[in-house]
């Protein structure tokens, strides 16, 4: 085999090894979870926020059901602003320090700092908002409709 062929083969193998290490779960969500735990000092598991109200979790619609759900809508809106700036919030990895009572975002590029700020603001909002067990795993088709959609259904 020629040396050039060996180099190409080596490059392909290295590329495949690197691709196999990529997680299919957005890594930023792991950091967001760690930030939530830092702020709430482990008092509530992160998964409690994944299916809460109309906005905590994937997507969101309608009117937030309470203050905690408004935190999630604000977080979604913040990620929307990050996307408008050309950032990919679910893939943006950032550094933060978990100082008691005052977690701080670390240095990084514009997107990393912006996304960290979104996550930090949401984590702080979660910590100060009451958690209503009745708003966990609600029927979003019934409780999270927009007013226009609800009016069309009643006509």
Curated annotation (Swiss-Prot):
The leader peptide range reads 1-21
UniProt keyword list? Calcium, Disulfide bond, Hydrolase, Lipid degradation, Lipid metabolism, Metal-binding, Neurotoxin, Presynaptic neurotoxin, Secreted, Signal, Toxin
Chain sites annotated for binding Ca(2+): 55, 57, 59, 76
One Gene Ontology BP term is: phospholipid metabolic process
| Co-factor remark | Binds 1 Ca(2+) ion.
Q: What EC number(s) would the UniProt record show?
A: 3.1.1.4
The protein here is known as Basic phospholipase A2 PC1
What's the source species for this entry?
A: Laticauda colubrina (Yellow-lipped sea krait)
